[in-house]
Amino acid sequence: MRTHGLRFDVNCSILFTELPLLERPAAAKAAGFGGVEFWWPWDDPVPGDRAADAFITAIADAGVDLVSLNFITGDIAAGERGLLSVPKAKDAFRANVPACAEIAARAGCTRLNAPYGNRVDPADARLTAEQDELAIENLLLAARAAAAVEADVLIEPINSVDVPSYPIDTSAKAIALINTVRAEDTALGNLKLLADLYHLATMSEDLSAVLARYADQIGHVQVADVPGRGAPGTGTLAIEPLFRQLAAQGYAGWTGLEYVPADPADTTKSFTWL
């Protein structure tokens, strides 16, 4: 499925939620898509062998690519947005890194998203510094593990309007983090920007300028309209010119559909904009 030469994949953690998780890749294929992506689909940092096998088999049997997989994100319903920088979750994240890399290797996934995590106490400067130091240590571990399976690690700015305690809320902050980690290990070339157009637009960033400025550092793109995080065409974001710009810049990756469908009981209705 292509528009302006772009390939679209379905985030099956937010779309097709009317179906059991393992049925979603096949539903995406039936809707005409060749790729899927997921947030970390288990509560535990290391899934059991049967769970991992079933997940990988569902994707393979559907005949779709696993485009992107998140490292463990924590309890999203409770407001968590990643464990990368969370001191109490240090052991959980580090247990998750090899597990995530192994699934990526088995499924042929080449993009692993590492959500930064919320500030534990934004008013505590010492704790904030501790979190940032931990994030760099964990990103070094994650990037090295990903490199071993020929995958990139994605850094995603998440808007601080919806998630006020999330510190990496702009493209500039994400790139600064990438550069900091690269300075620690100059051999690491697999840290990339995840350009989520919804989050960037919610932060009032100039999307065309961001796509141009960081063209060679974008590892993945995601899309939802603004406001509301619905399907393209439900808000005010001029998305088609951005797609044309990405194609003109030579972007060869996937663009993930990561929006909330108007009818959660029938995701396929949300694809009429394509």
Language-model region placement:
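N-terminal small/glycine-rich loop or linker at the start of catalytic domains
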Residues: M1-C12, N70-L83, Y116-A123, I158
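Histidine-acidic metal/acid-base catalytic patches
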Residues: M1-G32, A99-E102, G108-T110, A148, ...
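Active-site-proximal loop/turn and secondary-structure-junction residues that shape catalytic pockets
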Residues: I14-F16, W40-W42, I72-D75, Y116-V120, ...
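N-terminal substrate-binding region of glycoside hydrolase catalytic domains
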Residues: P25-D49, N70, G74
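Conserved beta-strand positions in the central sheet of alpha/beta enzyme cores
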Residues: E37, S68-N70, N113, L154, ...
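Active-site acidic/histidine proton-transfer and metal-coordination neighborhood
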Residues: D61, R81-L193
